[in-house]
A protein has these predicted regions:
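A solvent-exposed, acidic/Ser-Thr-rich amphipathic alpha-helical stretch
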Residues: 19-23, 27-72
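A short hydrophobic beta-strand element
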Residues: 70-81
Length: 123
């Protein structure tokens, strides 16, 4: 299984506001944890993204990608930039650890970023 390509696909789906595409890459029961927030399921994550970003017209872009692929795990550092239609944008460094099962489906995502960097954008 090509975890590098599957990780590319995951972030492409997030950037395209494609909840179905994200779901297709994930195993049943996938768990997601961001910073010190409670662990959530995929439905809760995508509902939050839809409310805060996707339905609000906030675009997501990834840059400066640094990725390490190991056995059933990918660790990626990148800069994520969120941009509103009025041109206002905010960026933060992010570290994401993605775990995969034997079929290459995502079983867990742990993501760490400075959420305060996005406060002015989302208020």
């Amino acid at each position: 299984m090509d975890l590098d390509s599957r990780t590319d696909d995951l972030f492409a789906c997030f950037a395209a506001d494609d909840a179905d595409g994200v779901a297709a890459l994930c195993a049943p029961g996938v768990r997601i944890k961001q910073n010190n927030a409670p662990e959530v399921d995929l439905e809760t994550l995508t509902a939050g993204l839809r409310a805060m970003l996707w339905d609000a017209g906030v675009a997501t872009a990834y840059s400066d990608v640094r990725r390490t692929v190991a056995d059933r795990v990918v660790t990626e550092q990148h800069v994520v930039t969120l941009s509103r239609a009025d041109g206002f944008a905010a960026s933060s460094d992010v570290c994401t650890v993605i775990r995969f099962d034997d079929e290459g489906l995502i079983t867990r995502i742990d993501e760490y970023f400075d959420s305060a960097a996005f406060g002015p954008l989302l208020s």
